[in-house]
Amino acid sequence: GLDKTTERRDFNGDGDGRALVTVLEQAKKRGMRVGVVSTARVTHATPAATYAHVNERGLENDIAAQALPGDATFNKRLRGGLDLLMGGGRRYFCPSGMTDEEGESCSRTDGRDLRQEVQDAGYSYVYNRAEFNLLRKRDLPVLGLFDRSHMDYEYDRPYDLAGEPSISEMTSKAIDLLEGKRRDNKGYFLMVESGRIDHAHHASNADRAMVETEEFDKAIATALRKVDLRDPLIVVTADHSHVFTMAGYPLRPLHDLPYAPVSAPADYLDNTVDHSGILDVVYGISASSGEISAAGDKDSVPYTILGYWNGGNPYDTGAAGVYRDMALGRGDPRRD
């Protein structure tokens, strides 16, 4: 079983060395179409767990080769291969020493260009938003790789030069492509991951995490609109929780601090009531001036509305400046 003694090196198997059957392998065995969509690299942990078998999650070159038909390293339990694979991680599909479509370096060490191999096998390959928008049902199977590594945060996506689709757009397109002609379709299994919510939290960036979550909510709403719920099953879950906690008892909306009440309701002024200010930070807002005081409101009642932190100092001077500014939105106080 899985407990605190499980080590990172442990293999995803049944204990005697045999690889477990993945959910996409089961779907393929039933004759279903299968697809994977992620805003992270398509070779990252969550998407890879649906179709690949490796001893270590970091073996992303091997994971990429297992997803699509090419040579003996392909996961033959997937039969003809994934019908649809969209997300980031382009560098694991092209050989080192070569640059990709956006001039970024590739990472494969075996000299293989999986992008060309899958096109030779009948796949449609797209790498930007314009090509993505042109995809039609007849273009299945499809490989879409929209970034060298993880796709951009939703907040930053409009600034991508090549153009990237959003997770809600990829969800909509994937459903259209996988449904195909209903008369010859035995159904489909689609896994959609909003992988960058987690990344924003690890960077202690509450704002980008919230924007990612909002876009994921749009993706769920898109799926609910597009399918007939008398037949498909839509499951929304998470692989773990995170550090974003709404707490306290603010009467003001989160986005409109100047309009806070001067004091808390009377029942919260009773010393027998737990005030649950998660961060033990006391702020007061004057309804007349809108100014924030570190001393609290006139009754010294904490108005903590957000408990949030993950990891070390996000402004660590030892970190790469470009990454730090990208992740934390430094220079834009609304993003910190």
List each model region and its residues.
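Active-site nucleophile/metal-coordination loop of metallo-enzymes that catalyze phosphate/sulfate
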Residues: 1-60, 73
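A post-motif C-terminal structural segment
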Residues: 43-336
